[in-house]
């Protein structure tokens, strides 16, 4: 199962999810050229 983790989650909640369900994936990618943001990708998932 894949579950979205809200950015408002506290560190304790995230650790609890890791211990309870499995792996938390938090990825953030940002591509910019000369100060102009071209691409922004943000993904957070919990894999049980």
UniProtKB/Swiss-Prot annotation:
One of its GO terms (molecular function) is structural molecule activity. Coiled coil: none annotated. Its main location: other. GO terms for cellular component: gas vesicle; vesicle membrane. It is found in: Gas vesicle shell. Keywords: Gas vesicle. It comes from the Bacteria. The keyword Acetylation does not apply. Gas vesicles are hollow, gas filled proteinaceous nanostructures found in some microorganisms. During planktonic growth they allow positioning of the organism at a favorable depth for light or nutrient acquisition. GvpA forms the protein shell. The gas vesicle shell is 2 nm thick and consists of a single layer of this protein. It forms helical ribs nearly perpendicular to the long axis of the vesicle. Belongs to the gas vesicle GvpA family. This is Gas vesicle protein A. It comes from Spirulina sp. (strain CCAP 1475/10).
């Amino acid at each position: 199962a894949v579950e979205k983790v809200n950015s408002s989650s506290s560190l304790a909640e995230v650790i609890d999810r890791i211990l309870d369900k499995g792996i938390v994936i938090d990825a953030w990618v940002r591509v910019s050229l000369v100060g102009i943001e071209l691409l922004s990708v943000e993904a957070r998932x919990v894999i049980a």
